């Protein structure tokens, strides 16, 4: 298992997701013993070493870059149309000695809806509730219903660097805004980074480097966007409509849960401060003393809100939030909030001597 070490000559274990790509100078891989000999037990199985940029001598240089892009889901399954689906189910039931899953009258409605001679996706069950599943006649592509065709994102980067022969500095910042692919409910990710680094040669044989890095990650999604949602999505019947004939979200269609069933917000901050002292008592012999501290804080809010289905008259009534998995009764609500803080300290003292023969 490889670890990610981020830094410029001095290193601290970190997540690559917290690094602004524009701040990367180089990426290298050290394997097993080679990495352990330098970074100890934290790198016993190898490391991916990401070296970040440093300031350069010369006039102050200001650089900006920005980009906009779009994402799309790939490899999305093609869904069988509802009439073919119903035929397959009836045939499978007959093969095991059972009766029709879809009655002849329902088959007629399914075909009529596909041909455009019937506008309603379902009918009254006789008790003022819309028919579902094997008694409905919709033609829903559920992947098309829940996945958007494109998701925009934007990224902006700004850096300032410069210095003299003895002192160099670099200040950089970035902003990433990435929208999710869900059509119902809001899912998005935002990342902010701010970095600073200064290196100064105190004497000919003593150099000091100080760097600081702050990264914030904001993540929002519907609380319902969990494993059960994706489990259900691939198993939904195309005959079950996403909306009833009145235009309301259909019971057990999960559109209501995604849009109004609550949301999850997460905010995570990473603060990293690093100090490196390099002594060179004689030419090509360097003694390195590194110290760093990374503080990680996270706050998370997760809520479940009541969700509704609608009867034939258009009146709302409570329905289960989690599609019958039994975790929440119809009409129930819940809020969970938690926060935590972690301090991670590292020190590294090593020496190297370079001689070319």
Regions found by a protein language model. Name each.
Residues 57-138, 176, 180-272, 288-290, ...:
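Surface-exposed loop/interface segments of Gram-negative outer-membrane beta-barrel transport/assembly proteins
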Residues 27-28, 48-50:
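Non-catalytic regulatory/gating segments with a bias toward low-complexity or hydrophobic composition
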Residues 1-12:
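Single conserved hydrophobic/aromatic residue that forms the stacking wall/gate
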Residues 13-31:
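Short acidic/polar hinge/loop motifs at secondary-structure boundaries
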Residues 13, 33-38, 55-58, 70-73, ...:
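Short beta-strands and strand-coil junctions in structured, solvent-facing domains, enriched
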Residues 21, 57, 153, 164-165, ...:
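Outer-membrane beta-barrel channels and translocator barrels
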Residues 49-51, 63, 157-161, 197, ...:
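Outer-membrane beta-barrel architecture
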